[in-house]
Amino acid sequence: MVQRKDPPSEQLRAYTLLIELLSYQFAFPVRWIETQNDLIQRNNTIQRFVEVGPSNVLANMAKKTAKGQYAEEDLVRCVDRQYLSHADDAQHIYYQYDEEAPVESADNEPAQPAASSTPAAPAPVAAPPVVVQTAPQPAAQAAVAVPDVDLSAIDVVISIVAQKIRKAFDEVPAAKSIRDLSAGKSTLQNELIGQLDAEFRGLPEGSEDLALEALASHFTNFSGRPGKVMGGHIDRLVAARMPAGFNQAKIRDYLSSHWGLGLNRQTTVLCYAVTMEPAARLADAGQATQFLDSVVSRYGGKAGIALQKRAEGGASQTSAVAQVDLASLETLKKEQNEYLHKQFQLLAKHLDLDGVAQPSQTQVQGEDTDRLAEWDAEFDEEFLTGMRTIFDPRKARRYDSWWNTAREDLMALLHDIRPAAEDKASQRYQSLVNRWSPELEQMLEHSAQDDTTKEKAQMLLDDVRASGVANGPVFRYTQPAMAPETKVDANGRIQYSEVPRRQLHGENKASTLNYAQVVAARHRDVPYAHLRSRAGVDWKYDDQLTDMFLNILSTGASTGLSFTGRRVLVTGAGVGSIGADIVAGLLAGGAHVIVTTSRQPSDVAASFRQLYAKVGAPGSELIVLPFNQASKRDCEELINHIYDEQSGYGWDLDFIIPFAAISEIGRQIDKIDSKSELAHRAMLVNLLRLLGFIKQQKEKRGFDCRPTGVLLPLSPNHGNFGGDGLYSESKLGLETLFNRFHSEGWSDFLCIIGAVIGWTRGTGLMSANNIVAQGMEDSLDILTFSAPEMAFNILSLLSGDILEVADDEPIYADLSGGLQGVSDLKDKISAIRKKIVSDSRIRQALVAENLHEQKVLRGTKPAEGNVQPPLKRRSNIEPAFPPLSDYNSVTAGLQSLKGMVDLSRTVVVVGYSELGPWGSSRTRWEMEHEGRLSLEGYTELAWMMGLIKHFDGDLKGKPYTGWVDSKTKEAVDEADIEEKYGQHILGHAGIRVIEPELSEGYDPSQKEIMHEVVIDEDLPPFEAPQGVAQAFKLRHGDKVILTPIEGSESVKVVVKSGAVFMVPKAMAFNRFVAGQLPSGWDPTRYGIPEDIVAQVDPMTVYVLCCVSEAMYSAGLEDPFELYRHIHVSELANCVGTGAGGLLAMRGVYRDRYLDRPVQSDILQESFLNAMNAWTNMLLMGAAGPIKSPSGTCATSVESMDIACEAIQTLKAKVAIVGGSDDFQEEMSYEFGNMKATANAEDELEKGYLPSEMSRPTASSRSGFVESAGCGIQLVMSAELALQMGLPIYGIVAYSQMAGDKVGRSVPAPGQGVLTAARESIDAAQSPLLDVQYRKARLDEAVSEIKRWRHKESQKLIASTTSKEFKDLDAHLQHINNIAATRIRDAQWTWNNNIRHIDPTIAPMRAALATWGLSVDDIQVASFHGTSTKANDKNESNVINQQMTHLSRTVGNPLLVICQKSLTGHPKGAAGAWMFNGCLQALQTGIVPGNRNADNVDVALQQFKHLVYPSQTIHTSGIKAFMLTSFGFGQKGGLVVGIAPRYLFSTITANKFEDYRERVLQRQQKIIPVFQRRMAQGRLFQIKDQSAWTSDQEKDVFLNPQARVAQKSTGEYSFPTTVAPVASSLPARTVSDDKQLFARSSDQWLRDSISKEQGNVSVGVDIESISSVNIEDEIFLERNFTPGELKYCQGSPDKQASLSGRWAAKEAIFKSLQIPSEGAGAAMRDIEIVSNGAQPPTVLLHNRAKSAADAQKVEEVQVSITHSPESAMAIALARRRL
């Protein structure tokens, strides 16, 4: 600071400035970026920035900004800035140097200069020296010394344990044991014991159960110094996390000088610092000291001591001011600069550089600057920007898949619910007729046989055959002539619309006019649209040409205009413009069209794609190219590209329609600006250049026989409107081409048709004038046009007849509608507008007056406060359960399959879930079929991404329950979630640019790779611990020299020349787009504990989340409920993975090699089955098989196939299936090396957004896009699903895996899955495919089995004596089991698997036949569809061949779903996500389209059995789907799924209604549970222990009938005594049971009674299981004892068990032969007691016992037998003689 006359005032100003800045900082939002830019950029350069604060945060930010943005500018201006922090640079700030002693100063006295030992020379009085005053110099405050304490054993124990369990030292209680802190993880516990043993060289017995403090007390011989383990941790901390040069010595020095810690306390702090290790290496010393400060601070709190850090700059109130003579300072600077300049000259001479060339370079730069300044003065930035080139043929979008859009439109039309008559009038209908092909006719012929589509199909078929479309595509204008209509309604609102023009016939009749009639009408003796020919210098009306033109219009409105084979360039065809309608007409006529756009292709591609899909006719083609008509280079490059045969299209243009325009509204002659010049350049100058470039190309190639037709867009506006810049001049300038046609030499190459464009309503230039159009027509007798009408006019000018004339002479087409020549046009328009506005205001005033009058007459309106605010819809997030209507509705139209299907071996899906780039299956489905999120979708994703969380408590002093913002804690209304977070959600979900924080910091722009280098010079010495140094020596041998450091355990290391190092390098990797999970996704939000998340690979937590959610989808609140119905060994876990735990594998290989911290048990997490193990340990607790398939991309299908096999072979009854894989850099890099994935860099250069880069079946596809996640299904036997009352989403009818062939390419797609259609020629005629035939054969087999059962039962009963009565039940059950098994085998043989009888039938056909379906009933094919060239074609070929071989009806194509266009390719999870999507399609009847398939590859046109929808199609219902998956390594898979309604046709109405009721009850119960747990973050319910105790484990495992019971708390566990439960195998009906008992037991009872000589009485009872109401608590309490209820509660089927006991009580009562007390008498006095495997015993109480005693009954025996629908009991009462 320069010394002023009044130093105190300067100090006061500085003080005030500092206070103001700090006040501003605290009071207002931080705007540091703007502030620092202003400070750095200002003219009076600031060279010294000082930050006052606890650390150098802002100084570092400013330093980075200056280096990044102002480095070159500072270099030119020789600016050298300093960035200092008050916390770290106090000495530099106060100019305090090591050799300088602090200056003492007295209070309130100015600083005096120090006395000199020699007298100073006298100074001139008139010129006092200017002095430079330095800042006040503080007195340093020393750190307070703290008594030193030795490092204790407990410090080391806590440090080692805390480091291992990843907690800070002060978060580990010394009173807890290692076992407690390990949370039951034996591996972690074992590892800790091993480390402590290595550290202390011996541990006491049972160390894991001792408190840490007790354990530490055993180490009485502890040396007070870190041992092997602790020392290694400290060394690793310093080596891996401290900045360069910040070694142990510096750490200790800092702790001593700044905190006053002694050597031993420093060691303790280092030990504790290990437990707080930073996540990455600290950037600089400032961060390192901050880290140490935080450790010391927490250490002080733990040690109970007050630690005070030395103040860096504590100073007295005043201090001395050092003064330096300014003249001396300037002299010193001058000498330094001269010296540096001499050094520069010497170095330049030595290096052979031109050291004096700089002035000339400066001069050149100055001249360039002057030229730029002159340009800016003449034009401006807008003009320069407007001329920039944007033409890039790589960004071209090409559309030519008319064949697929026609098929797609026909399918959508047939499935549309609108009446056929309405469809006939639609543009889609007319477009289909124009795009006719044999394939469409075949599709209609097939649909005409279907009742749901018959009417539409036959009508369209008749129309097409009658119209004769064999002549090729035409553009036919079918719209009525439209007129503008402007109305002012009663409220004063101006309403504009367009209505058909009508012609009156008498008073009450009118007819709609066609457009040709309207334009042919006369106006001033000429039609509204007419042609003129040259007459001297003028253009005169030409009758002959006009008649020709009007005839062409009539033809275009009737038979149509053909443009087949024409090649046209159109510039300026935005949405709603005339150009867009011209393009539509050309495409409908079969033309090849190039359209240019000045916008990014990704912005306009959707609209052009839709345009082509609507009208693109056979042979038509649309190419969209970026192009700026204001750029000369673009004009030249565009035409060159069109004509170039090598790199371009090799076209010769038939027409050019240059309609590109730039609006200049509001610019009069005094406001002509650069935009006007730019518009003039685009609409005139460069339009002429375009024509010139075409002429050059045609002349170069000798194309002088086919002139290109030029449609000039002229205008009747010759300044009439005014205020439109140079627009009129641009249009008038084009008219010179009429004369140049003759005066210049290009008439052989170009012909001119000038079209004067009339008033066209609704276009960009004229839309503001729509409301005055009617007034103009009425008052001036002119004709205005709609955009389609004007386009029709222009398309008629492109006919061959008109062109023939134009070849010889330019044509002038007046399409102005009479507007040309109207005088005072602007005034007339203004008058009409003024009248409309006036009418509007008058009516508004009348309305206001009327309201005021009503208010006066009827009183005031109700207070606003009484008006209820509008209700806002709330989100309702719930599992998407399948709808269940009544039995007749569900089975309507289906063949009856009752009793035909073996349900025990039929696989159904009862639950599913997923986790992927679009979140859950619910949110993914919304995006997949709708392309947008609902309120529920936004809410769920906002929760999933951590943007909101649920709150229940006091918020701002008021009770509040609902969502709050996770950061601000402000309440969030669900209706506002889309507005608040919508853009963030859409930007951070789905396929997008990789976010490093979601992939462990992986940034593809800095992909790290190791590079080997050999050093050629000795490196500077560095300090390292002894052990590390010896390791260097061991690796590098004599290339490393070690030198001990006196007084230290460390050594000095010198690396000699010749040593080989691996040095990291970074490179940009071009695969930087992927489908990551939504940003902010956190497994702890689901309820997974943090220690589990830290332990396992991310892929495992994906599986845990998905399996947990799949249970809710199945209606299961607790997975243990499954064990009420199955044995724990009957649940299989078949979830697979393609690659396994990538992060865990990285730890095993890379991180371990790089000596980074890695958990010791990382190996277990890298195993493929680790996720299955964790799922079972934390959630399922099953003892069934764990099968871990790895089928690369087909893993999920292989998992499903394994599960189906397990259920069908009765090895399991329930299975968890699916797949999971992660996205990490290693696999991404290797897929890129294989060229399998899309090159994101190339894709961006082509103009594709990240979300568009996965384009299955598109002609532009270039590889798949990786993604990550998991997909899960819960499958089980249909029998079990019906028994449990679980929702059934679909039937898995068939699954198969297949290899391919001999080869050398592992990833090559194969055709092995063709074998699913393997079939002989005659097999399709097999009677086994006839349901009725199979039913007859099955009935025969079942009847035979029933006869056998009846015979055996009679034989058994007849031979059983009363003494053997107790064994009767078991023997009968055995017979029933055999019979039931034989019936199921018969069902399996005659229905489920008819290929056992005839293996020549195709597996797919046989699977469909089970349900009465054929291959024609498969409606949807979910494709693997990876977006690679090879896969998509191969997959289409395979499916098409299968359908052809199986004789699928031609004209009945499959609708193809390509899900990966939305999700990317998750490898292992792919098939599971696809399967989930298919289940959702079955449930809704919706087939989602592939929105990224902008143009389906023409190579797929040959596959007639396939349609590739790009838009969603709503069907009336889907019967069946097929899914294919192709994985690297010859893993082909196929699954066929069927709608669940076909399963319900196999059961009776009563059984279905019972099932339906239980399913609905289950759903009603689970939905609030799901929502509550989601809000509370407890979706994942971790299991702490199995359903059995350790004592029960053996009994549970060995008892096949062991089942859990539900406790009063709702939990499931095995009863204390695991008793056998009655088998659930019997399959007799009630009628069978009654018949058997009536015939068999009668004989047995007679024999028994006769044998007992009359002392036995018998009771028999049969009860329907469904008749016993187990929900009636009063009934249960009156009739059953607590013991009976407890036993029944623990049985697999509580209702069946209670029904059996009720039948037994009734039978016993009958056997006692005592008087009845009525039907309502309680039965509690009769108790049935079960004792394990023994027959039940009977206990009588109270009145029942008294009655039995009176009857001298000494013993009562009972036998209970169950069937699926009934319970039967026989009781024998034996009396005393």
Swiss-Prot record:
Residues 563-803 are annotated as: Ketoreductase (KR) domain. Residues 101-124 are annotated as: Disordered. Residues 110-120 have a biased composition (Low complexity). GO terms for biological process: long-chain fatty acid biosynthetic process. Residues 151-237 form the Carrier domain. GO terms for molecular function: 3-oxoacyl-[acyl-carrier-protein] reductase (NADPH) activity; 3-oxoacyl-[acyl-carrier-protein] synthase activity; fatty acid synthase activity; fatty-acyl-CoA synthase activity; holo-[acyl-carrier-protein] synthase activity; magnesium ion binding. It holds the Pfam family ketoacyl-synt. The keyword Mitochondrion does not apply. Coiled coil: none annotated. GO terms for cellular component: fatty acid synthase complex. It comes from the Eukaryota. Its EC number is 2.3.1.86, 1.1.1.100, 2.3.1.41. The active site is at 1193 (for beta-ketoacyl synthase activity), 1424 (for beta-ketoacyl synthase activity), 1465 (for beta-ketoacyl synthase activity). It catalyses: acetyl-CoA + n malonyl-CoA + 2n NADPH + 4n H(+) = a long-chain-acyl-CoA + n CoA + n CO2 + 2n NADP(+); a fatty acyl-[ACP] + malonyl-[ACP] + H(+) = a 3-oxoacyl-[ACP] + holo-[ACP] + CO2; a (3R)-hydroxyacyl-[ACP] + NADP(+) = a 3-oxoacyl-[ACP] + NADPH + H(+). Keywords: Fatty acid biosynthesis, Fatty acid metabolism, Lipid biosynthesis, Lipid metabolism, Magnesium, Metal-binding, Multifunctional enzyme, NADP, Oxidoreductase, Phosphopantetheine, Phosphoprotein, Transferase. InterPro entries: 4-PPantetheinyl_Trfase_dom (IPR008278), 4-PPantetheinyl_Trfase_dom_sf (IPR037143), ACPS (IPR002582), Acyl_Trfase/lysoPLipase (IPR016035), Fas_alpha_ACP (IPR040899), FAS_alpha_su_C (IPR047224), FAS_alpha_yeast (IPR026025), FASI_helical (IPR041550). Signal peptide: none annotated. The modification O-(pantetheine 4'-phosphoryl)serine is found at residue 186. Pathway: Secondary metabolite biosynthesis. HAMAP family: AcpS. Fatty acid synthase is composed of alpha and beta subunits. Belongs to the thiolase-like superfamily. Fungal fatty acid synthetase subunit alpha family. Fatty acid synthase alpha subunit; part of the gene cluster that mediates the biosynthesis of oryzines, natural products with an unusual maleidride backbone. The two subunits of the fungal fatty acid synthase oryfasA and oryfasB probably form octenoic acid. This fatty acid is most likely activated by the acyl-CoA ligase oryP to give octenyl-CoA before the citrate synthase-like protein oryE catalyzes condensation with oxaloacetate to form tricarboxylic acid. This is Fatty acid synthase subunit alpha. The gene is oryfasA.
